[in-house]
């Protein structure tokens, strides 16, 4: 079992509510309990090692994929259905309870984020944390303080092992 709760020290933590560090088994439980989950992926997912795991996560948990940046091509090349959306626009939409979602069935209650630059996703999740009831779970290598839950700062090898463990637990 990979310990993904390590290395979560913050340097700017005064007055900030930070995310809870979690292990892959807890993430799997949260995904299974979500009523309307959405898997949000960034451009970093195009690395073959990560893309294969992202596809397995989405398929095994039956989660729709919101591809941001240039990540859509990787999923389309693998024959996986994914919808493109700008990350900042998605963050804005998630704060609107009346948003119909990417599939027209309503807003999402949980988002799972993977492979974003830390400084970029933290800003988007700041909006969802403060202006919506959406739970955000980061399964990337970096600890994301504005997520509801996040893996800690882990090595690439530990990250791959954690994603494999998550897939096994779904």
Curated annotation (Swiss-Prot):
Pfam families: CO_dh
Keyword Electron transport: no
TM ranges: none
Record keyword Coiled coil present: no
Matches recorded under SUPFAM superfamilies: DHS-like NAD/FAD-binding domain
Superkingdom to which the source organism belongs: Archaea
Keywords: Methanogenesis
Any one Gene Ontology BP term: methanogenesis, from acetate
pH curve summary: Optimum pH is 8-9.
Pathway: One-carbon metabolism; methanogenesis from acetate
Complexes and interactors: Heterotetramer of two alpha and two epsilon subunits. The ACDS complex is made up of alpha, epsilon, beta, gamma and delta subunits with a probable stoichiometry of (alpha(2)epsilon(2))(4)-beta(8)-(gamma(1)delta(1))(8).
Record-stated family: Belongs to the CdhB family.
Role, per record: Part of a complex that catalyzes the reversible cleavage of acetyl-CoA, allowing growth on acetate as sole source of carbon and energy. The alpha-epsilon subcomponent functions as a carbon monoxide dehydrogenase. The precise role of the epsilon subunit is unclear; it may have a stabilizing role within the alpha(2)epsilon(2) component and/or be involved in electron transfer to FAD during a potential FAD-mediated CO oxidation.
Name of the molecule in the record: Acetyl-CoA decarbonylase/synthase complex subunit epsilon 1
Species annotation: Methanosarcina mazei (strain ATCC BAA-159 / DSM 3647 / Goe1 / Go1 / JCM 11833 / OCM 88) (Methanosarcina frisia)
């Amino acid at each position: 079992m990979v310990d993904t709760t390590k290395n979560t020290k913050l340097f700017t933590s005064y007055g900030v509510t930070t995310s809870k560090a979690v292990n892959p088994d807890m993430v799997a439980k949260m995904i299974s309990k979500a009523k309307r989950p959405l898997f949000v992926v960034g451009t970093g997912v195009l690395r073959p090692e990560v893309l294969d795991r992202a596809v397995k996560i989405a398929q095994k948990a039956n989660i729709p994929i919101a591809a941001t940046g240039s990540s859509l091509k990787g999923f389309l090349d693998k024959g996986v259905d994914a919808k493109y959306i700008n990350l900042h626009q998605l963050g804005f939409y998630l704060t609107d309870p009346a948003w119909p979602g990417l599939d027209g069935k309503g807003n999402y209650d949980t988002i799972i984020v993977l492979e974003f630059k830390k400084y970029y996703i933290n800003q988007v999740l700041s909006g969802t944390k403060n202006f919506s009831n959406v739970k955000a779970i980061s399964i990337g290598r970096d600890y994301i303080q504005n997520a509801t839950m996040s893996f800690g700062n882990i090595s690439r090898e530990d990250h791959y092992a954690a994603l494999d463990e998550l897939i096994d637990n779904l």
